[in-house]
Amino acid sequence: MKLLHLDSSALGATSISRELSAAIVAQQRRLYPEVEVTYRDLDRDPIPHLTAQTLAQTDPAEAAAAEAVMQQFLQAEVIVIGAPMYNFAIPSTLKAWIDRIAVAGRTFHYTANGPEGLAGGKRLIIASARGGVYAEPSNDFQEPYLRQLFGFLGIDDITLVRAEGVAYSPQHRADALAAALAGLRAEQDAAVMA
């Protein structure tokens, strides 16, 4: 099994989404010892944002790099994304990666009945970290966007592991992380029992 692990937080070692995504990948390694993991840190190794030049693909090296990103995505059976909430949405580095994989004719196509995803059969696990608590859907453009986008690509097996309110206090941060990790352990136990 091939697993693609992406982190997008700019907070480095203090990042909750990075800690959660690492725990998810460790869980997958325990459940599936044969898993092959490809890791990309979108903060340390960002993908260029789309411009007229990148869309034209006139630079062979840039075109090859974009194709490598696409192949990593297409070959992965499981995708783990560390996705913190920045200003109600996702980091621009994650959006730049999404722009490279959401490509007509590759991961979706248009039909007489509307668009159809071509990237089904994958499992997506999102490690979501939020400084506040966003129970009101009108304030959350992160998780709905990720669900919509990956659903559009044909991925319907989506799991969210969320730690929220992490900016309220050190105790709230610790409690939110512990609750998210406990949820992961419960999921792992259920998978082992199945």
UniProtKB/Swiss-Prot annotation:
Keywords: Flavoprotein, FMN, NAD, Oxidoreductase
Cofactor(s) recorded in Swiss-Prot or TrEMBL: FMN
Catalytic reaction(s) noted: 2 a quinone + NADH + H(+) = 2 a 1,4-benzosemiquinone + NAD(+); N,N-dimethyl-1,4-phenylenediamine + anthranilate + 2 NAD(+) = 2-(4-dimethylaminophenyl)diazenylbenzoate + 2 NADH + 2 H(+)
Stored Pfam families: Flavodoxin_2
This enzyme's EC code(s): 1.6.5.-, 1.7.1.17
SUPFAM superfamilies found in the cross-reference section: Flavoproteins
UniProt superkingdom: Bacteria
One Gene Ontology molecular-function label: FMN binding
Record-listed FMN binding positions: 9, 15-17, 85-88
The UniProt record lists the keyword Oxidoreductase: yes
Entry note: cofactor: Binds 1 FMN per subunit.
Family statement drawn from the similarity comment of this UniProt entry: Belongs to the azoreductase type 1 family.
Role this protein plays: Quinone reductase that provides resistance to thiol-specific stress caused by electrophilic quinones. Also exhibits azoreductase activity. Catalyzes the reductive cleavage of the azo bond in aromatic azo compounds to the corresponding amines.
Quaternary structure, from the entry: Homodimer.
PANTHER family: FMN-DEPENDENT NADH-AZOREDUCTASE 1, FMN-DEPENDENT NADH:QUINONE OXIDOREDUCTASE
Protein name: FMN-dependent NADH:quinone oxidoreductase
Gene from which the chain derives: azoR
